[in-house]
Amino acid sequence: MKKIILSFAFALTVTSTAHAQLPVTDAGSIAQNLANHLEQMVKFAQQIEQLKQQFEQQKMQFDALTGNRGLGDILRDPTLRSYLPHNWRDLYEAVMSGGYLAAAGETANLLRKSQVYDPCASISDKDQRIACEAKVVKPVQDKVMTSKAYDATDKRLQEIESLMQEINKTGDPKAIAELQGRIESENAMIQNEDTRLRLYQQMAEAQDKLLDERQHELDAKDNARRGYPQPKALEAAY
């Protein structure tokens, strides 16, 4: 009997130990862990969305300061790049040697419209006639050049005013920078053309002196041919 009791007690002990080793499933803990995991996933998604928005905002700011808005040529008039001809010195020399025949374009048109009497028509000597014609054409040519310079400068100033109005219409920093660059470019072109115009005026004054000197020489030549006494200054020169 004692052996039976001991055997039964041993069996109970083994059974209790076996039950103690089985895992216990806690449904509440699993649900809480899942909820925590989902909450973390939502936070991660929100952080990713915030980072995406920050990136887009930085990209917009970068694009606002960089890139090309295509405003470098807005309101630009290509005819104003050089309203004074590059060969104006050649034009002067052509008039000096060709007279009326060298007058072309606007100069010839203005000469025909403004001339009421030709003071050179009655001159029979060819050199004297061409010299006379050159003196007639020269101021007309100067007026055409000066008028072109004035009109072009006025148009450039109108362009600058329009560009300033465009600046007031936009809030794009890069567009404003491009428009300001255009304004600076137009101002530089006005200064460059002003320098060219000053050189042109100096050349015109020198050309007037050459025409006067040429006329004096032709008069002296004609006087010598006629046997008239020449001025002492000319006698010393020859």
From Swiss-Prot:
Lineage top rank: taxon: Bacteria
Region (Disordered): 219-238
Signal peptide, first to last residue: 1-20
Keywords: Signal, Virulence
Similarity annotation: Belongs to the virb5 family.
The protein's role, per its UniProt record: The virB operon is essential for intracellular survival and is not involved in the invasion process. Constitutes a major determinant of virulence in mice.
Additional remark text: Transcription is turned on at the beginning of the stationary phase of vegetative growth.
Protein name: Type IV secretion system protein virB5
Organism: Brucella abortus (strain 2308)
Organismal lineage: Bacteria, Pseudomonadati, Pseudomonadota, Alphaproteobacteria, Hyphomicrobiales
Gene label: virB5
